[in-house]
């Protein structure tokens, strides 16, 4: 029985070829994103937090075809549906090289009090480093390694100009409309000028509304995460 907000559902078109479904899942109310290519219906799943049946149901009812599972970091509340989705779709599991061992640590994952179905180790298929890319057809996801919440926390950036589907006058402001206080998606560019929104970043728990994820959990480092917020950012992130 889910103790989270598995019925929270939001679907949005961000560009001519990029759509996103957000689900809030599990006891920790974790954001899970299904990013899909509007032209092909191919999709990937970011942070399969919990409630695998809810994720599978949303994929099915929207006619989507999963290609990858991306994990921003290896904390329990972001991966409890990982095994079920891997078994269902037999698709690559993608995580940073640094955080990959966490997916194998059943004891650490299962010690959290909200785990109802014991987690079983999942071996990742793709190990990422800074700047590595994952492509969903013509949509490019660039990896950003952002230590602090965990040593290998990753964010995934979509640069609109490097995807072939450019925004039109009809939907150019939907990215700005989509950003809200409950998301862990952040835009690149000026949120007050929709034409200047250059892309979006899926941040996991590295960046939250009004702050950042805990650094008191295993692998957290306050100094590392403070550097992310105090160092000049060439990425024009808002």
Regions inferred by a protein language model and the residue ranges of each:
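Active-site HxH/HxHxD metal-binding segment of metal-dependent hydrolases
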Residues: 51-135, 139
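Short Gly/Pro-enriched turn/cap motifs at secondary-structure boundaries
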Residues: 23-25, 117-118, 123-125, 145-149
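Residue-level detector of conserved, well-ordered beta-strand and adjacent loop positions
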Residues: 24, 36, 129, 135, ...
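Residue-level detector of beta-strand structural context in well-folded domains
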Residues: 33, 126, 131-132, 154-156
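Metallo-beta-lactamase
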Residues: 109-111, 139-238
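Short catalytic-loop micro-motif centered on adjacent basic/acidic residues
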Residues: 44-46, 68-71, 143-145
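Single conserved hydrophobic/aromatic residue that forms the stacking wall/gate
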Residues: 1-9, 232-238
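Conserved beta-strand hairpin/beta-sheet module of binuclear metal-dependent hydrolase folds
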Residues: 10-62, 155-164, 195-203
